[in-house]
């Protein structure tokens, strides 16, 4: 069984390469995309088509609902599930997506968490009735840890308080005593190299297709069902559409421009992250990369 990862900025063609290679190299695909994990967020996440999902087994697509939290621990569980099924069915595994933080965590690992008692969980749950107060408590317990998160990050505030009340250690001290353990540090990473002008054109074209496919209708349905509160509803493409529905963005052309601009800014951040976090990657243009991966999978 071979494992590879394909990374690159949003709209660079990662999913297309992955599906093509998977069909030729007997592989399953694990999606590393922070929006594709959500059911019902289909158009704005640019998920693989229904035909592609039928053709190649995918993990990490439609695994939870927009009002539920998706954690890195959940991603690591999905990875283990994908790996086990690949071994069972004698398949290779292709990891692909723009949320490279999850891939980085797969390589560096995360600190193991203790089992939290029912008493501790109940106590923290009560404290979290007032998230602002919970954050202030965390600031007193561990100013260093609190500085790394926002006062609205309920998930990490909860984790910090759970660790403290379960172990008696400030989260920073706990993580120092329990360093991360790598899960798989030997994954070969391939990156799509693409120039800014070409990428911007691809982003603009994809944004137009999203709107034509019914992006606005999708967001209306999501807002009605889940409200605007979940973190997933603050994603690029969703927040701009909500502004359009509110009248803050005046017309479709301006909506396209806003989504394209923010997506291009995201792409730049993704490229910076990939450049600084993954040292031993192979970066090639689309066609060259596909050829290189096919050769590697055949060896």
Swiss-Prot record:
Residues 33-36 are annotated as: Interaction with substrate tRNA. It catalyses: adenosine(37) in tRNA + dimethylallyl diphosphate = N(6)-dimethylallyladenosine(37) in tRNA + diphosphate. Its cofactor is Mg(2+). It is an enzyme of class 2 (transferase). Its EC number is 2.5.1.75. GO terms for molecular function: ATP binding; tRNA dimethylallyltransferase activity. Catalyzes the transfer of a dimethylallyl group onto the adenine at position 37 in tRNAs that read codons beginning with uridine, leading to the formation of N6-(dimethylallyl)adenosine (i(6)A). This is tRNA dimethylallyltransferase. It comes from Nitratiruptor sp. (strain SB155-2).
